[in-house]
Structure formats: structure tokens, C-alpha cells
Amino acid sequence: MKSLETMPRYKKELTECARNLKLPFLAEHLDEILHEAQEKQQTYSEFLSTCLMRELRDKERRSYLTRLKFAGLPARYDLDLYDFSRTEGIDQRQMRELRELVWIRRTYNLLLVGDSGTGKTFIASGLIHEAVKAGYKAYLLTLEELFVCLKTKEISRPAMKTYKRIMKAQLLAIDDVTLFPLKLSLIHISEPTRRRGIS
């Protein structure tokens, strides 16, 4: 994109207004949008609609990437790749129902139970990803990570950041529940910390 110094005055003013109004996509792609409007001979209302819709889509894209970044997902989380032949634990109909996320809207908790290697973490990660795509703030961590965070948040800045992220999450998936030996001193969690989610 051209620098402000080399732009015509009206483009410079539009770009500055877009930045001040926190419309980064419009500020960055103004030339492209103006050229398209001229090519298609858009009306004023069509041009305005184009600007706002593209800004909105870009905002949704950036919001999704931010939620995905902070979700704590492993490398593989695409439920389309789930191998239904390897386990009798869940069938395709049940998977489709889970992916509809009705259980989130109804604030149900899910408990995934099975032997090691049957895909519990993969399913939980995939459902977290489905929730992120649907606009939810979701987070995946192990039970050990959760309790370490709760125990050290007052003395550790990273732990406090994780704690704040957990408290803002609309869906929390807790992995490796049966692998972490609970100590009595760690079991007492304050009421605001109790979240709905998957375990």
C-alpha cells in the first residue's frame, strides 16, 4: 500500500479515519476496495456495504485466530480425521451431535472415558476447535496444569495469565484427569474457578 505522503488527499483522509476508527482492513486495502467499486460501478450504499462487510469478516478472522492461538490445542485436532474404526467408544452420529455444540448452549458437562490411546484427547481438542470456530472462548489443559496454575498464580506472572485466560473461557477441557494424583490441599477450589467444560 502507498505511504500517506504519496496518496491523494482524500485517500489520505480516508486512511487516517479508518485507522482512528480502528478499521485496519479498510485502512490497509483502501486502494483495492476503491478500484473494485469503480470497476463494478457500485452505488454509495453498495460501496459502504462492501467496506463494512469486509472489515467485519476480517475482524471475525482475526478474532478466530486469537481464540485458536490461546486455546492450547495440540498439533492435531481436526475431527474430520477421527478414525471411527479404531474404537467402539463413539459412532459417527454421536460425533455429529457433539459437533453441533448443543451441550455448550445447554451448559452440560461432558466426561470422556476410555483406555489410554482411544482418542479422548483428540476428541476433546476437536470439540474445543469446533467451539472456537463457533465464536466461543475455549481452553484445553491437563489437570496437573490447572492445579499448578491455581497454586502458583499469586507468585507467578505466567500462571496468573493462564488463570485469567481460564476465567474468561466459556469452555474448559481438562485432560489427563486420571493420571494426576490429587492432593487434599489442591482439591479446594474457590467457587468462581468452577467452570463448565469437558474432562
Identify the role of each PLM range:
Residues 112:
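Hydrophobic anchor at the beta1->P-loop junction of P-loop NTPases
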Residues 24-73:
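Interdomain "pre-motor" coupling segment immediately N-terminal to P-loop NTPase/helicase cores
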Residues 158-186, 190:
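Conserved nucleotide-sensing/catalytic segment adjacent to the nucleotide-binding pocket
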Residues 187-199:
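Single conserved hydrophobic/aromatic residue that forms the stacking wall/gate
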Residues 100-107:
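Phosphate-binding P-loop
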Residues 115-134:
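Walker A/P-loop
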Residues 79-98:
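N-terminal pre-Walker A segment at the start of P-loop NTPase domains
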Residues 91-93, 140-166:
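Short glycine-rich substrate-engagement loop in P-loop NTPases that contacts/grips substrate
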